[in-house]
């Protein structure tokens, strides 16, 4: 049996084999080695000129990274209290595998600390919401843009933390994560086609099943801009869009459900024939959170 490094080298010499069945066998064997061989594949890519071989190497690197993403999401979902932000970072890593995540974590911590300094126990929930909105959208000048499936980066939490515009998903994730870290009762709820956070009253218990959670909601916040609005505004939204209000719309979404929703929306950005494989892969990834 060949030593590990020798076998990898031998497999590399066969990547350009014209027989697709041979390449499939070689590819699957290399995938068994996992992500540690990615630097070697990248080095091979840099020293390869043949177009088909380059595409094969790129595909293998992508599959190795996707395998890691699947494992990271499974590990995250299995945690007793999975962080919403850390779940969103997994999707950032899918799209930008070389991006360092610690600077994003540090930036969020700065925002959390500055928000905490402005809060006190005497503020009403609406005053708390105004503090968060001022910190995010005035002090840090986070910008909100309409949801567009032509701009996948807008869905990622990395965008608002890097002074780039974020859509309702990215900005709402930052807002919701802050509230969870600061123990503020603002939760993502299941309003159709919207990213809405509901501020629940202090006597509401998130893990208790109640017949009508709407009774505990004080007001709502729109994720793109942090703007608060009332139940009357919500009722008008349903009326305007011919949506029949249902109790399920007011139920809190778990962090796993939020991240699943994010992944499936992000997948819609990849509908072109050349990128459709990404949509299929993301839909499969989201199934981990079923």
Region spans (language model):
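A structural boundary/capping signal
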Residues: 1-290
């Amino acid at each position: 049996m060949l030593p590990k490094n020798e076998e990898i080298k031998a497999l590399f010499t066969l990547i350009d084999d014209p027989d697709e069945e041979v390449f499939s066998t070689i590819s699957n064997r290399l995938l068994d080695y996992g992500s540690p061989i990615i630097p070697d594949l990248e080095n091979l890519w840099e020293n390869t000129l043949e177009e088909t071989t380059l595409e094969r190497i790129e595909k293998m690197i992508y599959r190795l990274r996707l395998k890691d993403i699947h494992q990271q999401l499974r590990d995250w979902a299995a945690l007793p209290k999975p962080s919403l932000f850390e779940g969103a970072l997994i999707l950032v890593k899918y799209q930008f595998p070389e991006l360092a995540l610690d600077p994003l974590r540090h930036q969020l911590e700065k925002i959390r600390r500055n928000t905490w300094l402005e809060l006190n126990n005497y503020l009403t929930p609406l005053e708390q919401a105004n503090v968060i909105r001022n910190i995010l959208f005035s002090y840090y000048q986070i910008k909100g843009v309409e949801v567009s499936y032509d701009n996948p980066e807008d869905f990622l939490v990395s965008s608002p933390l890097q002074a780039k515009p974020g859509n309702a998903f990215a900005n709402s994730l930052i807002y919701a994560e802050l509230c969870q870290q600061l123990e503020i009762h603002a939760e993502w709820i299941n309003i159709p086609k919207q990213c809405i956070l509901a501020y629940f009253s202090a006597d509401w218990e998130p893990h208790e099943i109640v017949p009508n959670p709407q009774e505990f909601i004080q007001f709502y916040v729109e994720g793109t801009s942090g703007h608060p609005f009332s139940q009357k505004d919500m009722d008008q939204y349903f009326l305007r869009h011919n949506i029949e209000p249902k109790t399920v719309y007011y139920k809190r979404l778990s962090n796993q459900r939020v991240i699943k929703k994010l992944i499936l929306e992000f997948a819609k950005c990849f509908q072109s024939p050349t990128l459709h494989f990404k949509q299929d892969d993301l839909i499969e990834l989201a199934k981990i959170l079923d």
